[in-house]
Design a protein with these regions (language model features):
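A short glycine-rich, Lys/Arg-flanked "PGG" loop and its adjoining helix->strand segment in the class I
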Residues: 88-100
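Class I SAM-dependent methyltransferase SAM/SAH-binding core
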Residues: 16-64
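A short SAM/SAH-binding and catalytic strip from SAM-dependent methyltransferases
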Residues: 74-85
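Conserved Class I S-adenosyl-L-methionine
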Residues: 116-144
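A short acidic, Gly/Pro-enriched loop at the edge of an enzyme's catalytic core
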Residues: 63-75
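Conserved alpha-helix/loop element of class I SAM-dependent methyltransferases that forms part
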Residues: 1-14
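Conserved beta-strand signature within the Rossmann-like core of class I S-adenosyl-L-methionine
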Residues: 101-109
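Core SAM-dependent methyltransferase catalytic element
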Residues: 148-181
């Protein structure tokens, strides 16, 4: 994940996935000290067999993630922030739980029109304002959304053409949280 050659990056780390979904998104991170899935539907996932994933599920709300300040070493969120109603509040919560010097890994679908289940239209400017400016970015890759797969341009040998600013795109970032916000 995020350009690491193996899982040793996660060794003895507390790793969390915000918007984890029901499928054990961190099952593979076996070298982590603790794996935490954070989701508003976490309680429901336990009834779907999530208790077999060898990770702790934590139910968040749209305004509170019930973890301590600076408690997470590696925080992932993959295509989840467009699902929240109050982006500034949840971004502040993500930054609160991530330790200074901790690694943030995120993927975001950009410029998609809002829907009932995805009420946010994320743009680079909105993400910079509420989240990314608090990180020292190590990598930032923004490509057009693929036609057959949202992520096809990340894995193809042919580089994508630069997208128009308002085109539907995918942004991947990896950064390190700066000192206290």
């Amino acid at each position: 994940m995020a350009g690491e050659k193996d899982q040793s990056f996660f060794r003895n780390q507390v790793v969390a996935d915000f918007g984890c979904g029901p499928r054990g998104s961190l099952c593979w991170a076996t070298q982590a000290r603790e794996r935490i899935g954070i989701d508003v539907l976490a309680d429901a996932y336990l009834h779907l067999g999530a208790d077999r994933h060898n990770m702790r599920y934590v139910r968040s709300t749209e305004s509170v993630i019930p973890l301590g300040d600076d408690s997470v070493d590696v925080l992932c969120t993959l295509n989840a922030l467009d699902h929240v109603h109050n982006l500034p509040v949840i971004c502040a919560e993500l930054l609160r739980i991530l330790k200074p010097g901790g690694t943030f890994i995120g993927s975001f679908n950009l410029n998609e029109p809002p829907t009932v289940t995805e009420p946010q239209t994320l743009t680079p400017e909105v993400l910079d304002q509420h989240l990314l400016r608090f990180l020292e970015l190590k990598s930032r890759r923004q490509v057009p959304r693929g036609e057959s797969s949202a992520y096809e341009h990340f894995f193809s040998a042919t580089p994508a053409k630069a997208p128009a600013a308002d085109a539907v795109q995918v942004l991947w970032v990896r950064g390190v949280k700066r000192g206290r916000n």
